[in-house]
């Protein structure tokens, strides 16, 4: 196959919604067929003259052992031999037309006299030229007959139209024959699904055959009106007089041959019925896909290839989707309209016969074109527009303004000022406390023993912290969705995001960490659960977090041979306290994989990818601002030097020496001190001696 000379480029689009809603409309049409070029062949020396081989008797006898095949118009395409040629023979009966002109009548009489000789030459021509054309019915090989039988509509000029959804399977003829058989009870869900779709395609073919039989047999019954494709026969410019029917034989061929009309049944779904267009998806074998498919699968792309069975599998469209970035790559790019048929495919056979097809496809769902250069500029423009729309632009008071205009001007200014203040009126954390919001994303998991995994997580908050969340919603523990057919050597894209908000007291120490525990569980087709591994990560609440994704190595207990048999045949999860296993404060010894105790050895399994982000919020310490403006001079002489005043301000504004100055903080400190005094007095009264109690009573 040779690609056309048109420029093909890869279209890159950003998918804003669900990729499963993507639909393509593809149109394919047979344009034309190129006949073989003229051929000059040497038939061998023939000694038919009386002067010997080296001395021909006449000028015409020079060319008697040579003949040429010249392609003519469509009306003469085929000839007697049906090879797609109009043969001009240079022999004694016809003569050398380049040097001698003869009338058509005399030429026809000469042809009738030399009919036997022409029959012999025709046999020689059919043996020497094994080329065939799709335009010829008599000389078409069995493969061409089968292609024409399956795709009569396409060969007769109809446009194949099909709509393909994302990851929608369309079978080729070989796949249809493979999945039409009953897969049995041990088949997978994918095989059963393909078998069901193959039966639907078979029913579509049988329904079409019944329509054809009804159209031929029942003449009085009202049947769907057939489509009539009429074509004007091209005639030669100079019509020869007295030419018999033998000079222009009539043959049956395709639409580009000499045919006046072809009747076919109206079938808009003939592309799906004839398996003309088929697709290859992620579930199919990589051996059927192009060479770059395995490399794309390793990078996490989802692939889809669209082929056309044009006497050989021809790749029309290749689509790949990056779920991490949300980008869709389409090669070649979408046409402005599927009816434009922008792309051309040229099919070459072993002989000089060529088939020309054109196709176009468009997207029927909205997509946003992705441009790296214009994306930032467009975003900046949108931000400026939002800022201008959200906040009124400052305007000046007109010089000659009436009283009503002045009142309206200041009213708008007050509304704008209140709107600006409302932007800062968000909920603050309690005093002497800090709010920490953690944004967690469990991205993917891979290299576990079994597929169909999901992850359960649990967070353990440190001391001097309080969980802050929506009532009835517990984000400290949860589970992800199950990834079907992923998690072993295939990457399971979990994509689970959640948020945890904590309040930290003043007594919180930076060494106190938030512990995050993971348990990876697989579920097989019999709904048996198996533990695939445990993981742990300690999150600091006050210090910085890594900006990149974190790769966590999962482990699980190795166990003995009985545990291995139970895991394989029965499944289930062992009672393993992984929280205490990862707690370093409760252990006096280090874990080792070389421990001979069967309860202690662990084995590594797969990995999890975790991404963290953190937001901190606290109230502004007003003591620094207060001491910055009002500093106290306690027993120190003031000097006029500016440097000494600045030093006094810095010393007085030190957080270690500063005290609470607001009324709320003073009252809170007073209440706390009163509680401590009452508690101390209560303890002292209980432990007092009887003599001291007696003296207190007398007093």
From Swiss-Prot:
TM stretches of this protein: none
Gene name linked to the record: Mks1
Residue span(s) of domain C2 B9-type: 434-560
Swiss-Prot/TrEMBL keywords: Cell projection, Cilium biogenesis/degradation, Cytoplasm, Cytoskeleton
Subcellular localization: Cytoplasm, Cytoskeleton, Cilium basal body; Cytoplasm, Cytoskeleton, Microtubule organizing center, Centrosome, Centriole
Assembly with partners or alone: Probable component of the tectonic-like complex (also named MKS complex), composed of B9d1, B9d2, Cc2d2a, Mks1 and tctn.
Cited InterPro entries: C2_B9-type_dom (IPR010796)
Descriptive protein name: Tectonic-like complex member Mks1
GO terms (BP aspect): axoneme assembly; ciliary transition zone assembly; cilium assembly; non-motile cilium assembly
Species of provenance: Drosophila melanogaster (Fruit fly)
Biased composition (Basic and acidic residues): 108-119
GO cellular component, one term: centriole
Tissue specificity comment: Expressed in chordotonal neurons in the antennae (at protein level). Expressed in spermatids (at protein level).
Function field: Probable component of the tectonic-like complex (also named MKS complex), a complex localized at the transition zone of primary cilia. Required for ciliary structure and function.
Disruption-associated phenotype: Viable and fertile. Minor defects in sensory cilia function probably due to lack of localization of the tectonic-like module proteins, namely tcnt, B9d1, B9d2 and TMEM216, to the transition zone. Does not affect the recruitment of Cep290. In sensory cells associated with the notum hair socket, results in structural defects including axonemes with abnormal microtubule connections to the basal body (BB); results in subtle defects in the localization of intraflagellar transport (IFT) proteins and an increase in the ratio of cilium volume to inner membrane volume.
Region feature Disordered, mapped onto this chain: 101-121, 373-396, 632-661
UniProt main location, coarse: cytoplasm
């Amino acid at each position: 196959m040779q690609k056309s000379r048109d420029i093909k480029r890869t279209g890159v689009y950003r998918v804003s919604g669900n990729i499963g809603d993507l639909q393509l409309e593809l149109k394919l049409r047979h344009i034309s067929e190129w006949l073989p070029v003229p051929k000059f062949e040497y038939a061998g020396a023939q000694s038919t003259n009386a002067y010997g081989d080296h001395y021909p008797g006449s000028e015409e006898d020079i060319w008697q052992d040579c003949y040429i095949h010249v392609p003519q118009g469509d009306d003469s395409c085929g000839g007697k031999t049906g090879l797609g040629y109009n043969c001009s023979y240079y022999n004694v009966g016809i003569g050398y037309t380049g040097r001698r002109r003869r009338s058509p009548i005399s030429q026809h009489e000469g042809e009738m006299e030399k009919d036997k000789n022409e029959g012999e030459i025709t046999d020689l021509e059919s043996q020497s030229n094994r080329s065939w054309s799709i335009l010829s019915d008599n000389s078409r090989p069995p493969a061409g007959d089968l292609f024409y039988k399956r795709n009569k509509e396409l060969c007769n000029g109809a446009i194949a139209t099909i709509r393909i959804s994302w990851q929608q399977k369309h079978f080729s003829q070989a796949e249809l024959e493979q999945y039409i058989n009953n897969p049995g009870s041990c088949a997978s869900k994918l095989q059963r699904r393909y078998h069901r779709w193959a039966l639907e395609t078979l029913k579509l073919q049988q329904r079409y055959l019944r329509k054809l039989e009804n159209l031929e047999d029942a003449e009085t019954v009202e049947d769907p009106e057939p489509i009539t494709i009429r074509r004007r026969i091209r005639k030669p410019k100079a019509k020869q007089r007295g030419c018999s029917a033998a000079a222009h034989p009539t043959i049956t061929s395709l639409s580009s041959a000499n045919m006046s009309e072809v009747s076919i049944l109206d079938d808009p779904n003939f592309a799906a019925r004839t398996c003309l267009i088929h697709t290859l998806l992620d579930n199919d074998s990589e051996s059927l896909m192009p060479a770059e498919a395995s490399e794309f699968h390793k990078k996490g792309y989802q692939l889809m290839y669209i082929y056309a069975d044009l006497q050989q599998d021809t790749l029309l469209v290749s689509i790949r989707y990056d779920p991490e970035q949300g980008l869709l790559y389409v090669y070649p790019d979408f046409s402005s309209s599927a009816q434009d048929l922008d792309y051309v495919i040229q099919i070459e056979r072993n002989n000089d016969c060529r088939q020309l097809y054109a196709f176009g496809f468009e997207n029927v769902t909205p997509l946003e074109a992705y441009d790296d250069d214009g994306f930032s500029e467009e975003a900046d423009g949108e931000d400026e527009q939002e800022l201008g729309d959200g906040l009124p632009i400052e305007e000046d008071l007109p010089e000659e303004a009436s009283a009503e205009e002045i009142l309206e001007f200041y009213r708008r200014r007050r509304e704008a000022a209140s709107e600006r203040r409302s932007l800062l009126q968000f909920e603050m954390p309690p005093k002497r406390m800090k709010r920490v919001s953690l944004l967690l994303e469990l991205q993917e998991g891979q290299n576990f023993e079994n597929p169909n995994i999901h992850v359960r997580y649990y967070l353990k908050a440190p001391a001097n912290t309080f969980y802050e969340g929506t009532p009835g919603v517990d984000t400290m523990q949860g589970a992800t969705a199950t990834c079907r057919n992923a998690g072993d050597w295939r990457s399971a894209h979990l994509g689970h995001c959640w948020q945890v908000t904590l309040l930290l007291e003043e007594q919180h120490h930076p060494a106190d960490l938030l512990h995050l525990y993971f348990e990876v569980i697989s579920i097989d087709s019999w709904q048996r659960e198996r533990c695939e591994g445990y993981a742990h990560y300690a999150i600091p609440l006050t210090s910085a977090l890594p900006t990149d994704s974190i790769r966590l190595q999962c482990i699980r207990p190795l166990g003995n041979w009985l545990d291995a048999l139970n895991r394989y045949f029965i499944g289930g999860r062992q009672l393993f306290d992984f929280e205490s296993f990862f707690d370093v404060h409760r252990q006096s010894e280090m874990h080792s994989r070389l421990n001979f105790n069967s309860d202690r050895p662990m084995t590594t399994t797969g990995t999890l990818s975790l991404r963290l982000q953190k937001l901190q919020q606290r109230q502004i310490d007003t003591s620094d601002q207060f001491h910055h403006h009002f500093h106290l001079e306690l027993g120190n002489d003031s000097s006029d030097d500016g440097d000494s005043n600045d030093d006094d301000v810095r010393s007085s504004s030190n957080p270690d020496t500063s005290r609470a100055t607001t009324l709320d903080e003073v009252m809170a400190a007073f209440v706390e001190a009163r509680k401590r005094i009452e508690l101390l007095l209560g303890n002292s009264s209980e432990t007092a001696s009887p003599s001291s109690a007696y003296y207190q009573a007398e007093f």
